[in-house]
């Protein structure tokens, strides 16, 4: 599995798991420079921040990707009780008794990557791209590299098809993720037109939820020392 930035395509077609947030939009922007066809797949699971679906649709049109599928997986909402699936549960900055944030949706990335794998199979795509990140992850076990490796192996074995799950952000911190968007001259688009906020506010968000805190801290760090952070991003590329 490739977790680093790639400089040339691994396949002519890629499926990007695309929420309309900072991370997946940055991955989508990069993929457009690397693949002949980029297909986005967005999941409607009855999420608290439902505005992200419309944001994803708008960005898909704006960036002129090959196709964009919105898939109804609201059955996940019936099983996975979380602050992101229940409006009555406030988003908390504290961890639950099990050590996880209350915004964790159990099984979400298992389901998303499985469905993205099936979609890639039908399209003849050899790559799934997802914006999960272990460096600055929010405590979600399904954002870890070991999890992604296990999912890739399961998909390859289960569908008897060579398929890579590519995670361009896995070892980047949030400041480097901003640098990556800037590298492709899309920092303003990512800053002002994506939706990361758990409370559904586009751009800089509510400023209070954990997602907004992480996003803002990364942006502040990048803007304070763009040259050094861009250099650290470049150094993380293969053969740098």
Curated annotation (Swiss-Prot):
Binds 1 zinc ion per subunit. Its cofactor is Zn(2+). Pfam families: QueC (PF06508). Its EC number is 6.3.4.20. Zn(2+) binds at residues 197, 206, 209, 212. One of its GO terms (molecular function) is ligase activity, forming carbon-nitrogen bonds. GO terms for biological process: queuosine biosynthetic process. It is an enzyme of class 6 (ligase). ATP binds at residues 18-28. InterPro entries: QueC, Rossmann-like_a/b/a_fold. It catalyses: 7-carboxy-7-deazaguanine + NH4(+) + ATP = 7-cyano-7-deazaguanine + ADP + phosphate + H2O + H(+). Pathway: Purine metabolism; 7-cyano-7-deazaguanine biosynthesis. Keywords: ATP-binding, Ligase, Metal-binding, Nucleotide-binding, Queuosine biosynthesis, Zinc. This is 7-cyano-7-deazaguanine synthase. It comes from Shewanella baltica (strain OS195).
């Amino acid at each position: 599995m490739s977790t680093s930035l790639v400089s040339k395509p691994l396949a002519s077609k890629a499926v990007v798991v695309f929420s309309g947030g900072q991370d997946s939009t940055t991955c989508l922007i990069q993929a457009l420079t690397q693949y002949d066809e980029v297909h986005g797949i967005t999941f409607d699971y009855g999420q608290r921040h439902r505005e992200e679906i419309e944001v994803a649709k708008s960005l898909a049109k704006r960036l002129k990707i090959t196709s964009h599928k919105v898939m109804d997986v609201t059955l996940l909402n019936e099983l996975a009780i979380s602050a992101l699936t229940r409006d009555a549960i406030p988003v908390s900055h504290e961890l639950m008794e099990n050590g996880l944030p209350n915004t964790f949706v159990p099984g979400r990335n298992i389901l998303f990557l499985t469905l993205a794998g099936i979609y890639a199979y039908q399209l003849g795509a050899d790559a799934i791209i997802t914006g999960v990140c272990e460096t600055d992850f929010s405590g979600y076990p399904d954002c870890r590299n070991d999890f992604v490796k296990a999912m890739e192996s399961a998909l390859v074995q289960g569908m008897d098809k060579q398929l890579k799950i590519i995670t361009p952000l896995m070892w980047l911190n949030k400041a480097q993720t901003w640098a990556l968007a800037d590298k492709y001259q899309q920092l303003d688009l990512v800053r002002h037109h994506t939706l990361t906020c758990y409370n559904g506010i586009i751009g800089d968000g509510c400023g209070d939820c954990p997602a907004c805190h992480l996003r803002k801290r990364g942006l502040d760090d990048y803007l304070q020392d763009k040259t050094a952070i861009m250099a650290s991003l470049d150094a993380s590329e293969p053969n740098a």
